[in-house]
């Protein structure tokens, strides 16, 4: 008799995606982050749902409703800490997942990669509107500064900014619509993630060598379900350590003060996971130029498959490319650090040099390194 999971119309889909899925036998722990991102998304949706039951999206009561959640709601403090720090864990997994995709050449699955970039942009948008909801000082001024950048768009910029704000400045209408966006976007992310998986299962997973693994595949369960469970234990432990012992470690002290439009904080900055993009934005003295550089820094991921010039897919056996990859990683860490510093020398010039290096590496040095490697590997006799 055929197993129910193989015959039932619904269970059959789950079976093909998570149980009997043929997976390469040599994929490493770097392939854990896809499942960890799924777990992070579930944690964020569940904690967010319970927080939304007690939150009020009104400028007069938003800040006090967050305080009420932390003080008066049963385990409200835990929900809030897990949700806020869960976002940080989400982005840590996201950056590592993208980094793995670049390192091992997974971007050559173009459909999967492009949906992934759209997912990244959607998650960033969700996190941004979510950061505004507690209505603290940094929430308010972060929203004001970032949304004001829309006014740099020629002709329609000011109208567009006022349309999104729902007025002439960030106010009640902005907070209400940002809450609506923050509620609906995670479900759009779930839909995109399903499409991401659909495209991935059309081609099968890549592996560290970058070589076609069809001749040596094993079922996903039990091998990789157990491997993913280990990653899950580390994720939950890290989240609990952060959420229970240092819940405000990654936050901004200014957000403990209610939003005040008449008092500007000395240094406006977003959450740590946006600092690299914020540093790129500030590195260009021109407002429109900064906005374009900010967009280009993320959208450049879409053209990475077109810039692949090497005959080998993965960086596993390519020392020149590995060196450039780790320089790029160090450059992004530098940009993250610069984004958290005040706008003064020497931070301005360091940010500008890091910005130039970022685009130089992706657009020129990496494609040239691929061509050079091809030349070196050609037989010369």
From Swiss-Prot:
Membrane topology classification: Multi-pass membrane protein
Subunit: The cytochrome bc1 complex contains 11 subunits: 3 respiratory subunits (MT-CYB, CYC1 and UQCRFS1), 2 core proteins (UQCRC1 and UQCRC2) and 6 low-molecular weight proteins (UQCRH/QCR6, UQCRB/QCR7, UQCRQ/QCR8, UQCR10/QCR9, UQCR11/QCR10 and a cleavage product of UQCRFS1). This cytochrome bc1 complex then forms a dimer.
Cofactor(s) named in the record: heme b
Protein encoded by which gene: MT-CYB
Source organism of the structure: Dasykaluta rosamondae
Comment on bound cofactor: Binds 2 heme b groups non-covalently.
Protein's UniProt name: Cytochrome b
Residues annotated as binding heme b b566: 97, 196
Listed GO CC annotations: mitochondrial inner membrane; respiratory chain complex III
UniProt cross-references to PANTHER family, sorted A to Z: CYTOCHROME B
């Amino acid at each position: 008799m055929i197993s129910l999971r193989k015959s039932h119309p619904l269970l059959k889909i789950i079976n093909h995606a998570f149980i009997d899925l043929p997976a390469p036998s040599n994929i490493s722990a770097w392939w854990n982050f896809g499942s960890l991102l799924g777990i992070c998304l579930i944690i964020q949706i569940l904690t967010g749902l319970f927080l939304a039951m007690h939150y009020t999206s009104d400028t007069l009561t938003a800040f006090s409703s967050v305080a009420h959640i932390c003080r008066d709601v049963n385990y409200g403090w835990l929900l809030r800490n897990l949700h806020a720090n869960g976002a940080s864990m989400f982005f840590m997994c996201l950056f590592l997942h993208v980094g793995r995709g670049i390192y091992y050449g997974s971007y050559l699955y173009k459909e999967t990669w492009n949906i992934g970039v759209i997912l990244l942009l959607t998650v960033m948008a969700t996190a941004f509107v979510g950061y505004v909801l507690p209505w603290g000082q940094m929430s308010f001024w972060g929203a004001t500064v970032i949304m004001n950048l829309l006014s740099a768009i020629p002709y329609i910029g000011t109208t567009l900014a006022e349309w999104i704000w729902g007025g002439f400045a960030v106010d009640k209408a902005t907070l209400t619509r940002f809450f609506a966006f923050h509620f609906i976007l995670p479900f759009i992310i779930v839909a995109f993630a399903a499409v991401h998986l659909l495209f991935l299962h059309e081609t099968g997973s890549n592996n560290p060598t970058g070589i076609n693994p069809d001749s040596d595949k094993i079922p996903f369960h039990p091998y990789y379900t157990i491997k993913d469970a280990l990653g899950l234990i580390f994720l939950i432990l890290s989240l609990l350590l952060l959420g229970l012992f240092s819940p405000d470690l990654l936050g901004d002290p200014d957000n403990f003060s209610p939003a005040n439009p008449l008092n500007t904080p000395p240094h406006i900055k977003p959450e740590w996971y946006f600092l690299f993009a914020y540093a790129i934005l500030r590195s260009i003295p021109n407002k429109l130029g900064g906005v374009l550089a900010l967009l280009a820094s993320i959208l450049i991921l879409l053209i990475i498959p077109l810039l692949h010039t090497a005959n080998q897919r993965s960086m596993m056996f390519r020392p020149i490319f590995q060196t450039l990859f780790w320089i790029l990683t160090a450059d992004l860490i530098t940009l993250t650090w610069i984004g958290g510093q005040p706008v003064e020398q020497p931070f301005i010039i360091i940010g500008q040099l890091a910005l130039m290096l970022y685009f130089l590496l992706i657009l020129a040095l990496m494609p040239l390194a691929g061509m050079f490697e091809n030349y070196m590997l050609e037989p010369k006799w």
